[in-house]
A protein has these predicted regions:
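Active-site loop of short-chain dehydrogenase/reductase
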Residues: 14, 25-39, 72-75, 142
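Active-site helix of classical SDR
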Residues: 18, 55, 63
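Active-site loop immediately N-terminal to the catalytic Tyr-X3-Lys motif
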Residues: 44-50, 72, 116, 121, ...
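Active-site loop-to-helix junction immediately N-terminal to the catalytic Tyr of the SDR YXXXK motif
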Residues: 45-53, 65, 93
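C-terminal helical subdomain
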Residues: 79, 101-139, 146-148, 173-190
């Protein structure tokens, strides 16, 4: 339940920020461009990520709805739905490595992807730049997947996790908690 509430809070926070900025632009008669990050789970669903899928689906619906509502004010809204892009934060939580499974998420992501690889951060940045560019003024209300066609070919990203045993889940949970604590300690300034 706590995770579902956190997902809902993230959606509400993002929606409040978007509404605040959008209303200000409308009052000042200024054009604007809002770019959100969602996930392909907004289309496919996926096991084991219900809180994330719920909150990201809310962002996806908000993007489509406000694109229509705010379009007459020259305010554009779009989303990017990235597939597997290896970052330390994501990888340490999605596939906590142990000595037994080093590189398992990379291998799994690459083998199930039609392009046979994971995304590179510059590719994600290039898409964001394109969507924010002045030359892209007519594109609004869209969610663009950048995942090498993975969601089209594989559907639910984490379906294979259904094969894990209780002991595996305990180990994963402990590793994720350690990763979260490490990140939290890095953010704390004393």
């Amino acid at each position: 339940i706590r995770d579902s509430l956190v997902g809902s809070e993230m959606c509400i926070r993002d929606s409040n920020m978007t509404n605040t900025v959008g209303k200000k632009w409308i009052e000042q008669n200024k054009p604007g461009n809002i770019l959100s990050i969602t996930t392909t789970w907004v289309w496919t669903g996926s096991p084991f990520v219900v809180p994330s899928a719920m909150s990201k689906s809310g962002i996806n619906a908000m993007t489509k709805s406000l694109a229509v509502e705010w379009g007459p004010h020259n305010i554009r809204l779009n989303c990017i739905a990235p597939g597997p892009f290896p970052t330390e934060g994501a990888w340490s939580r999605l596939s906590p490595e142990t000595e037994d499974n080093k590189g398992a998420l990379d291998q799994s992501s690459m083998s199930s992807n039609p392009m046979g690889r994971v995304g590179e951060m510059n590719e994600l940045g290039n898409l964001a730049t394109f969507l924010m560019a002045d030359g892209c003024d007519y594109l609004t209300g869209q969610t663009i997947a950048i995942d090498g066609a993975a969601y089209l070919s594989a559907g639910g990203t984490f379906a294979s996790l259904g094969k894990l045993k209780d002991e595996d889940w305990t180990n994963i949970r402990d590793t994720i908690k350690k990763s979260n604590e490490k990140d939290k300690n890095l953010r704390n300034t004393k």
